[in-house]
């Protein structure tokens, strides 16, 4: 970003300077409030998951089927990607290919500049965290506003995400209230005077703060939980409705999706839609499950772009053993059961992908040149 250009969005935290895992873990262990916040949240999520999984008689068979589908996609990924590209193109979607983070960030920024927009609203997305899209857009004078409640807390708090599913899991409601009171007014509608730390009040403040951004946004950016190869259908699941707002109000939608998110057919998608909500949020189904195939006149975005991102995934795929990490559907169940994560938190892992899967997938995607990545095998009790 130019030295003369004023920031539009809150200055985020940075992964730079976070020490190697053994040292970072000691910092987390010394924070009693952090451990209390994490223990409360992960215990709650674990209990809900156990109840919902027990309702499905063939739960383990479903998990096996999902792994087999992912493995089949990995063996024939080139074929499925080309099939998905053809189907999406036929449906009116513009497909882009990004080798790495720089490619993806450039593509998204170029689309925004071509549309003449200086701000975008975002759906919660791990992959855009991975490529640091928000800062890349900020450097181009484009404000990226997070609309997921937890991501909003992280953004307004000049913070970093610490959990795959609940990025602000390390914050309690008292801290959230302080962030809203101090920061909301700097970037839009302020928090109501005299707001308490009662969750409904905090949620209402976030809703009002975000509504003006939704209504004026001309472009949205999302990730994607799945892409169905045979139909070119994109799938996003979420629990708050902010994603549905991003998918329906703006005229332009850009979805950045990792190449491993392909599933062959709608029937295959069914397996994952049974597993993901129960394993992540402990719900029978996500309150908002959005599937869209191309452009429909008068309904939703009229200009759709999909950026298919590699960013190290091909390298992971070339490892006969390590490629199993690409089965991950970002449910976060491994974080919620991990005694190490529960005690040290997500920031100790030094990247947007924390917990057991992050300790594996992060170094696979980035390589082992950084000492922090070489230290991540120590983030295990095995």
Question: What residue ranges belong to the model's regions?
Answer:
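The feature marks the mature, well-folded catalytic cores of soluble enzymes
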Residues: 2-321
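Ferredoxin-type iron-sulfur electron-transfer modules in oxidoreductases and energy-metabolism complexes
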Residues: 299-325, 335-336, 340-382
